[in-house]
Amino acid sequence: MITMSHQLEKLGYRKYECRSCGNTFWSMKERATCGDAPCDEYGFIGNPATDRSYDLYEIQDKFMEFFAERGHEPIRRYPVLAKRWRDDVFLVGASIYNFQPWVTSGLVKPPANPLVVAQPSIRLNDVDNVGRTGRHLTCFTMGGHHAFNSEDNTVYWEEETIKYCHDFLTHIGIDPSEITFIESWWQGGGNEGPCYEVCVRGVELATLVFIQYRTLPDGGREEIPLKIVDTGYGLERFAWISQGTPTAYDACLGPVIEKLVELTGVKIDEEILAENAQVAGMMDIETYADLRELRKRVADKLGISVEELERAAAPMESVYAIADHTRCLAFMLADGVIPSNVKEGYLARLIIRRTLRLMKDLGMKESLKDIMNIQVEFLEGHYPEIRSHHEHILNIIDLEEHRYARTVKRGRRIVEKTIKYLKRDGKAEMPLEILIKLYDSHGIPPETIGEIAEESGFQVKIPDNFYTLVAERNETETEMPEEDVHLDYPATELLFYDEPDDLEFQAEVIGIHENGLILDRTLFYPEGGGQPSDTGYITAEGCRLRIKHAEKIGAVVVHRTDDEICIEPGTTIRGFIDSDRRLQLTRNHTATHLIVSAARKVLGDHIWQAGAQKGVKSSRLDLSHYRRITLEELQEIERLANEYVMMNVPLKVRWMDRDLAERKYGFILYQGGVVPGSRIRVVEIPGVDVQACAGTHVHRTGDIGLIRINRTERIQDGVERIEFSAGSAAIEIMQKTGDILRESSDIFKVTPSQLPGTCERFFTEWKALRNEVSRLKEKVASLKILEMKDRAERINDLTVIIDTVDADMDEMKNMALELSATVDAVVLANPEGKIVGAASEDAVKAGLRINEVISQAAAVLGGGGGGRPHLAQGAGPATDKVDEALEEARAALSTVRN
């Protein structure tokens, strides 16, 4: 722990030890406890701690202005979708996430130094507590002032940080004698360091972290070159203590809550709310047992039963949770999260479906789209980016609401089947793992599962922290660690960046690795970024090697060959690139950028590249999107991409410092994925697209030639795949399509323009003929049935029909079922070795099992059969033994007594 007592002492604070929790803390006045709950009760409810009341946005402005006046550059908030610039977490959980890992590792300069930001942040690790405790939120605004100190540039450290905090709190009218600084340790997002938790009247308002370490995978830590001031001021809590309302929701979401109360008719009991918040503040609410204990304590204080408390509090808690959740969704969806069954999309869908369930509990008739509209209208005055995505947000919510309704309807059958299996295994209660799996895999809410289970007398216990458990399983990316292969050779000089048109080069062999050559320089593009490697050949001293693949291991390019290597290290070689392949891959790569840009224009700026694979003949591009792309949209994307080609825009390709590139272009740079390094290669198509990209590209968009979109498919929930071709491959596809059109026209002896109408007419006529054939078959079958009825025979006490018919399996089943209404048993076979049996209800009650009869008969055909006692079928390859099979059936029936 670094020592930070000097500044605190100068400000008049003294060190104490909390008699309740044992933590070390600092205070201006002598006190026994540290000032944080549960050691101290909330002392601000009904008794505001500041000199005036602030709403959330007033305190946010006050915070930003305070630090701007003290030399901090205000920066715009980052998207809550952290995957825009990092690949280890899905959502922003604190303002420091904005600068991890690139700035905090020292690789990249910060956007300003020092800086201040009001960052919307999302944490779902307490989602079940939202609405219940008065203080828990899924989405909150973290005010952060940050300073990044290096060896040659010390901005400020602990003394200034502590004074800034003290001054800001007193600036808004908080009595300094009520402020405590608790010594602690912080860890998050891959970094850690000592910290102070700053509390007033029982609530933690800010955390002052002094980041000095990187957290290692094994739990250890190592020092980092930067020393970072990372502060987090909970701005919702500042608004809360300034207003003294019963809950933080009332202080920050008042207009939305008022509208929800009006719509639901829920009665707000401020006595219960205040008492609940007071008691919750004294508890660490982590588990189901904690929540039960909270309710018991509140009920005891109010002199009512737990059941009475739950009846009174549950509707209010639902209103608060809906207000919080819709705010969280507004930021998620505006910033590009697409609800799905995976990754950040799963978390968005979890919040959507939990909100829908809460609305159902309240008996709300309004749609979630209606409620989201209320929330968006409230937020858009403060966040222009939410205003610009208003329609997009509502479209997604509307679609998700309909999907949820279908899921619940479909879920009944799945739940009933699961309960049946559990009962068969002797279980009387659904295990938690299965409850979570039904939600995780099928989207069935636990409350719905409980309702269905209750109907069949099966027990389901839903933990109060169910959604928290589910969220925790899905909050971070889980990837298999890659094997770290290191080659002890100098970095390969990559010639294709400076000389993109060259196809021949000279280099020296500096090593051999497995079946590959390592050169000091190369024109071979190694596979990466979804672009396959170049191929070609290498020659030296009469030796010629075909290069099938080039790959980059670290900074070293290995040129793979299937030939026996006949070149020694130290040899000078000549390399030759397959020109047609390079040209097609280059065209397809630039075409990918154009299609992404066109898709964003047509579908919306939520579109984000989820993957890509370039090819010679065709390429594919995966895009995040909440619904299927329509034919009209696809045609417009194709038209726009080709318009970019015809504009013949010259590309600008250059290396830039990462921080400068991000400042100029934003995170749109990382459409193709997050790239490492302090310097990145920026490929800009002015007025069209810009991306950080290491692939090969044409000089001008006109060099691509034709772009042809071939097809689309939904490869997973929330991801659309576009398959396309460019250049000569696109022309080839067009010509093949034209050939198919001409051949089809020739078959019908019409012109291509007449083909759709002709096909429609032929299809209509074919359907009519099919219906006529079906009608005639039914008539023939009826005649055949009459004929067979006349040939019914008696076997012991049974009336049976055994015959061969020229009909398929379905037709034989229909015949057998119809005949079994007039006789005891029917066995029919066709010349293809198919056999069917049916038995009347009376015959089955008397003991006839037609499935056993058919099984014996099918065995004669060399096959097998089965079914139910009243209807069965079978088949076998021995078509010459159909008559024998029927005789076997006759023999089997002769053993049955009616």
Swiss-Prot record:
Superkingdom, natural source: Archaea
Location within or outside the cell: Cytoplasm
InterPro entries for this protein: aa-tRNA-synth_II/BPL/LPL, Ala-tRNA-lgiase_IIc, Ala-tRNA-ligase_IIc_anticod-bd, Ala-tRNA-synth_IIc_core, Ala-tRNA-synth_IIc_N, Ala-tRNA_lgiase_arc, Ala-tRNA_ligase, DHHA1_dom
HAMAP family for this protein: Ala_tRNA_synth_A
Family, similarity comment: Belongs to the class-II aminoacyl-tRNA synthetase family.
UniProt cross-references to PANTHER family, sorted A to Z: ALANINE--TRNA LIGASE, CYTOPLASMIC, ALANYL-TRNA SYNTHETASE
Name of this protein: Alanine--tRNA ligase
Organism listed in the record: Methanothermobacter thermautotrophicus (strain ATCC 29096 / DSM 1053 / JCM 10044 / NBRC 100330 / Delta H)
